[in-house]
Amino acid sequence: VLTHAHEDHIGAIAHLWPKLQCKIYATPFTAVLIKEKFKEKHIDITKDLQIVELNGNISLEKFEIEYITLTHSILEPNGLRIKTPAGVILHTGDWKVDPNPLIGDEINSKRLKEIGDEGVLAMICDSTNVFSAGRSGSELDVRKNLLNIVNRLKKRVIITSFASNVARMETAFYCAEKSGRQISLVGRSMHRIYTCLLYTSDAADDVIS
């Protein structure tokens, strides 16, 4: 059961699956990326890849699992409410509370509050930057600052980023459009992510390979 498509969560799946031969559950964008990984291994995963709708539910024997939409730097990050015979477990996956998400849906804070009110036996939580005080900045702030920089520059602009940081990729597309530039993606992972975006969202179509 996959929460989102970052490499540290799905990178080993095509290597492990031949030994496990199990069903894989994922939301649409994550599922498209997984298919691409299995294609590289010449494995047809179609019949074992189960696509779960956003905020959807699945049943696995004694476990009832509910997907909860969160916000992060990639499309379709999900938390999991796992109902077990012993009680409810909340697995957050990776998340970042962004009041102005530039990609995907807003965090389903209403459902998270309901789950908290209902009672949770244990929460398994992403802890990146847990020792940093204050709030994380919004990608909207990055977009504004980056656009100001790009507008001041007259020649080629090179932007580095993790390929799976879809929010940053979208910011780069936005800045290119507003400044009258074209985008050239460099790297196999960048092209893979972009191709998957074309299948599942309204990604920019003015990219130079």
Question: Where are the regions that the model predicts?
Answer:
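Core dinuclear metal-dependent hydrolase active-site scaffold
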Residues: 53-112, 116, 177-179, 209
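A short acidic, amphipathic alpha-helical/loop segment
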Residues: 12-19, 78, 171-175
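Catalytic metal-binding/acid-base residues of hydrolase active sites
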Residues: 6, 96, 128
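Cap/insert and terminal regions of metallo-dependent hydrolase folds
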Residues: 29, 99-188
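Divalent metal-coordination and catalytic microenvironments
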Residues: 4-5, 65, 72, 94, ...
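Single conserved hydrophobic/aromatic residue that forms the stacking wall/gate
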Residues: 199-208
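Conserved P-loop/Walker A NTP-binding site and adjacent catalytic elements of P-loop NTPases
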Residues: 27, 34-37
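Active-site metal-binding motif and surrounding structural segment of the metallo-beta-lactamase
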Residues: 1-26, 114-123
